[in-house]
Amino acid sequence: LTSGHNVQSTVFIEVSAEYRPDGPEEMRPVGEVEFVENLVSNRGGSSPKTAAAIIGKADLKLGNNVRPVLEALAAASPDRFRGIRHSVGWDASPDILNREIQGALSTESYRDGARQLADMGFILENSLYFPQLEELADFAKAIPDLTIVVNHIGGLLRIGPYANRDEEVFGEWRKGIALLSQCSNVVMKLGGVGQARYGFDWSRRSKPVGSEELAGSLKPLMEHCIDQFGVDRCMFESNFPVDKVSYSYNVVYNAFKRLSMGYSSTERSSLFHDNAVRVYSIGG
């Protein structure tokens, strides 16, 4: 974080860790927010501001009954808690890790839970796979007052049944991104492509990928997102430490800088800083 990229703040996104060991099952994820809040509070004033915003986890399938969980999460971090991530990635292939039941976004219970989230002024981080983008668009239209932050350029897949089919896969992904971009309450995060399911070989190389090559690989993907959503609804994400299996923090941020060189200083400020400050309500 202090390696020359002028990182001013970070956002903590849940990783299903440090849960409460007992108590009601639905309340156990509160332990993760309690852990992070305690960690950050004990550090005192620091620069950059670590975990200036915290995204926890709650099961939206609880429907209206998720509200006490959200209240507990907010109480655990009154100044930093901003919302939750409920990953809904599902695919019929056994090669793809399923994180939710099929069609979770379309269930009334999940939507009722999401309405509780919106009513309390919190945001929803959403991680899914690209064949679900149309379902997410329908969900976003049904709850227009909920800000939805889509993770990792919309869940591109290039493994299992999606391997060696780039023309078809990229075509369907582009269509899904274009459809989702019509929902004004949706924001896109640009990153997370170092994970194995994105089908690149960077993690298997004997020599690490450099920022110039990485920028070349990322540019067409991220430019499509920016073209569809606009500069004001996109933001770069490191997805660290998860993505460090494929490249270093320095390399990925240098790649972001390279691929964004054609944008104005104001546009780059939006992509690297301003949009995140707005979406996550990060103070000065």
Task: Label every PLM stretch briefly.
Residues 100-235, 246, 264:
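Catalytic pocket-lining loop regions of alpha/beta-barrel enzymes
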Residues 1-21, 26, 76-101, 146-147, ...:
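Active-site gating loops and adjacent loop-to-helix segments of metal-dependent hydrolytic enzymes
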Residues 13, 57, 87, 191, ...:
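Conserved residues at the C-terminal ends of beta-strands
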